[in-house]
Amino acid sequence: MRFFPLSLAGVFLLAARVVVVVVVVVVVVVARRRTRCVDDPVVIVRRATREAMDAGADVGVGIVVGAECGAHPRQTTTRIRPAQPSHEAREHRRNAARVMRANASGVGAVDARALRATASATGRRVSSASGSRITVSRRRVRAMATTADGERVKKLQNGSDIRGVALEGVEGEGITLDATTASAIGRAFADWLMVKTGAREVTIGVGRDPRLSGEMLRDAMFAGMAASGAKVVDMGLATTPACFMATVTPGVEYAGSVMLTASHLPFNRNGMKFFTSAGGLDKPDIKDICARAAAYVEAGGLSVNAPSGVVRAPFLPTYAAQLCDIIRKGVNSPTHYDKPLSGMKIVVDAGNGSGGFFADLVLAPLGADTNGSQFLNPDGSFPNHSPNPEDKEAMEAGVRAVLSSKADLGIVFDTDVDRSAVIDASGKEINRNKLIALLSEIVLKENPGATIVTDSVTSDGLHKFIKAKGGHHLRFMRGYKNVINKGKELNAAGVVTPLMIETSGHGAMSENYDLDDGAYLAVKIIIEAVRRRIANEPSIGQVLETLEEPLEEAEVRLKIVDPDFKAYGGNVIESLLETVNDTDHPLFGKSSPAEDNYEGLRVCVDEGDGNKGWFLLRCSLHDPVMVLNFESQVSGGVKIMAEEVGAWLIDQNFSKLDASAVHALYRTP
C-alpha cells in the first residue's frame, strides 16, 4: 500500500470537511430533539406539565396539533403560566383535563381550540395554537390518559360498588372505565386498605367473572396495587361470594379482595366490588376510594401493565369444597354421608357466567346427576340469555332444562353468583317473593319467631306467609346493602334476624357472615329438598302452595327532569301523602298509607270483596327516576289504580316528571 504525503493546505481542507460533517450531525440531532413532540405527544404533555407545575401552577398542559406522527404537521408547543391564585385554577382543572382525555378505544384526539378556551377561563396564556388535531395510537393514548378527568372517576360509584362502561359496542355508551382508571382504583384501594388495617404491607386477591374486559382491568388493578406496595394474588375466574371468603378462610385470609363484575349487566359493562374480612365495603368507603383514585388519575403517571411476580392462586376449588362440606353436614345422611345427593338430579343454568363450577365442583362430587345443565362454560358475550334470575327469558330457559331432563331441581345463577333462583320438579319458578317465602320457611324452622328483613316491594301475600310461619316481617327499603345492614343492626340489638333478602335474589344469612351468596342460598334449599325427600315430606314446591300471589302486578319508571331530582321526587311523595290522608278526597276511594313506610309511600287500596291491592311510589336510589309498583288481586286492578294515579299526576301538574309510562298502563287497549 502506498501513502501519498499531504501538503499543509490539504490537511486544512480535510479538517474543514470533518468540521462541516460534525456541525451537520449536531444540527440534525438538535432539530430532531426539538421536533420530538411531533413524534411523541406524550413528551409534550409531560414536559409542559412539569414546566407549569415548576412555575407554581396546579395544572400544566402540553399539546401538539397537526397530522399523524411522522408527517409534517403544523405543530406548536404551548406553555401555560399561572396568572391567578391556585384555588381558582383548581376550579378549572376538569376543563384542562378534558383537553387531554383519550378515547379508551385506542384513538385519542387533542384539540388546541379547547386548550385555548381553557387557558382563557383559567387566566393562563397560551403562546400559540393552530386549531388542528392529532390522532395517536393506543399505546400513546394510555400515557396521555394520565390527565383524564378525575370527576369522571368519582361518578363511577354505584352505591357500594363501582360500575362503568369498559368496552365499546353499544351505541351511545362511551367508555368510562378504562385501564388507567382501573389502575388508579387499584392503587387507591391498596392505600385505603393500608390505612384501614394500619399495616405497611397487605395482600389483595383479585377475581373476575368472564367479561371480555376482565383481564385488561385485572392487569391494570394489579399495576396500581403493586405501585402502592401491596402484594397481589390473581384468583382467576371467581364469584363475588368467593372473593369475600378468601378474606376469612384460614390459610388464605387476604387483607382485602376485589371482584371484577357488573352482575347481569350487558357485556360492555364492568365494575368492582370490594371486601375485607368485615364484609363488603359501604358507600362512604367507596366514595373515599373513588376520591383517592381521582387524584391519582389527575396526577398521571399510572402504569396499566401487570407487574412481574403476581401470584396465581385460583380460589374457586377451595370455596367449592367449603360448600360441599356444608351440604354433607346439613343433610347428615346416615347411609351416604360423603355423597348425600345420590339419586338426585339437579341441573344448573349458569348463563355463561361464573356459576358453572357449582355443577362440576359441588353437585357432581356429592353424587348428584347434573346431566341437562346448560350454559356452564364462561363466555363474557353471554350468548344465550341474560344471566339474571329476575329475567323472564333466563327463568324460562331454566324451566325448559328442568322439564326436558326430568330433574328434581333446577338452579339459575346470575353472572357473579351472588344471586340465584330455583325451579322445582314441576317447572315452577321459585324467585322473587316465592324465593323469599321458601327461605323464610327454612330459617323459621331453625329460628322460631325470628325476623325476616326484605326490601320495600315485597307482596302482601309474602307478609301473610311469614306471619303464618310464626315470623316477623320487616319491609325495609330497596338496595341489598340497605337490607343487609338493617339485618345486621337488628342482630346487634338482640333481635334475631337470620335472613335479609331483596326480591332481586340478593339474600344474606347471619350464619354465613351476612354475605349475599347465591350459591349458599342454593345450598340451603338443596339441603331442605333432600331432607324432605328422606323424610317423605311435601316437596319444596308444595310448601309454597299457601303463598298468596297477586293476580296482576306492574312496575313503571317515571323520569325526573330536574337537577335536584331527589328533592323533586320527595315533593311528589309528600303531595301524594297529603292526598291519601285527605279523607274528603275521593280520588283513591278506600285507601290508606301502609304502616312503617321506610321508603317512598306505599298505599293500601281496598279493591272490594275482601281483596287488597297496593301501589308504591319511591325514588330510585341513584338515578333521576321515580319507580311506581302496583299489585292487585282482581282482574283489571292494576289498570284502575294506574288510571287514578295518572289522573292525580295530571291534576297536580308535575311538569318535570315524565308520567307517560303510567298513562300507558291504562290507555293501552
Language model: regions and residue ranges:
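N-terminal small/polar loop signature for handling phosphorylated ligands or for N-terminal nucleophile
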Residues: 191, 195, 203-269, 361-423
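N-terminal chloroplast transit peptides
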Residues: 2-16, 31-32, 37-48, 52-131
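Long, low-complexity Q/N-rich tracts
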Residues: 18-30
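Phosphate-binding and adjacent anionic-ligand microenvironments
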Residues: 409, 448-629, 634-669
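N-terminal plastid-targeting presequences
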Residues: 33, 47, 116, 124, ...
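An N-terminal, well-structured beta->alpha segment
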Residues: 134, 138-223, 227, 309-346
